[in-house]
Amino acid sequence: MKKKVIVGMSGGVDSSVAALLLKEQGYEVVGLFMKNWEDDDTDEYCPAKQDLIDAAAVADKIGIELEAVNFSKEYKERVFANFLEEYSAGRTPNPDILCNSEIKFKAFLDHAMALGGDLMATGHYAQVREKNGLFQLMKADDGTKDQSYFLYRLNQAQLSKTLFPLGHLLKREIRDIARRAGLPTSEKKDSTGICFIGERPFQEFLSRYLPRAPGEIQTPEGKVVGQHHGLMYYTMGQRQGLGIGGSKDSNGEPWFVAGKDMQRNVLIVVQGHDHPLLLNDGLIADNLHWIAGEEPKTHWVYAAKTRYRQPDAPCEIDRLDSGTAEIRFGHKQWAITPGQSVVVYESNVCLGGGIITSAL
């Protein structure tokens, strides 16, 4: 009997090809379109209506059933509330990571199983491998598109039910497959930005949910060089949008955000990309999650990323205790950002990671 796979279909080319490949591999395939955001569903910023139309057109083309489900309540409670909480505390969260572990691979997975699915699948660029009774999350073959960073919070139960049909393909190959199959999404551009913000200005969006609290921009020595609009709008290493380019007595080098003093509501800035305050030897992380269900060895050489699309950086886990980890890098890392995730790898295997609380 054919295994039934419930495929998350977003209306984009990747999930379209994922569904097509699974159908060709002999699975019974059902597409499931998720709606995760409702507050201001304007076509300009959140094109969910068009995405559903596109997903339906693809499902019709390849001859599969498409269902739709609304997870906006779950998204608001499990992802968006944390997003606002983190920004209020001066950190820079990554809601896509929480969306994966709480919505796409929890709420979606539960719904997929309720629909009688044996497995679920998405168009993520990653791979799953079973080895010695454990499921491993592997990097995709296309290193420029690998999304394992966003999936590091998945667990054994989730991975055991998940297929990533695109993990061994390059992006250009996926476009070619879509064109050859005549899929309506073959030329559709990739979506960018946080899913619920879309293409809209970030400050405009955030100010609707959190109060603005303007304050001073200062150098580490305490010199006032400008005014900020609210600490929540800025992140470590930020260069654009500071409004202090022509500050008097400046040495002509660009300004970068180097810290936030939450108690005084002061934004700390420095000049020069390689200023010492922007270069870090390591970090402390909490909220740890290890995919295998057990901690990795300490004082062992791994690699880690502290942001998406960053090259892997050699590191050691110096300490693991009380739910926190201290990670030291072989060479200095630039603008490590509290609230972002550090994700640890051993070769192409994603081991897990945690949320950065501070840089060292």
UniProtKB/Swiss-Prot annotation:
It is found in: Cytoplasm. It comes from the Bacteria. The active site is at residues 99, 195. Its EC number is 2.8.1.13. GO terms for cellular component: cytoplasm. ATP binds at residues 8-15, 34, 123. It catalyses: S-sulfanyl-L-cysteinyl-[protein] + uridine(34) in tRNA + AH2 + ATP = 2-thiouridine(34) in tRNA + L-cysteinyl-[protein] + A + AMP + diphosphate + H(+). The record marks 124, 340 as: Interaction with tRNA. Pfam families: tRNA_Me_trans (PF03054), tRNA_Me_trans_C (PF20258), tRNA_Me_trans_M (PF20259). GO terms for molecular function: ATP binding; tRNA binding; tRNA-uridine 2-sulfurtransferase activity. Residues 94-96 are annotated as: Interaction with target base in tRNA. GO terms for biological process: tRNA wobble position uridine thiolation. Its main location: cytoplasm. Disulfide bonds join 99-195. Keywords: ATP-binding, Cytoplasm, Disulfide bond, Nucleotide-binding, RNA-binding, Transferase, tRNA processing, tRNA-binding. Residues 145-147, 307-308 are annotated as: Interaction with tRNA. Catalyzes the 2-thiolation of uridine at the wobble position (U34) of tRNA, leading to the formation of s(2)U34. Belongs to the MnmA/TRMU family. This is tRNA-specific 2-thiouridylase MnmA.
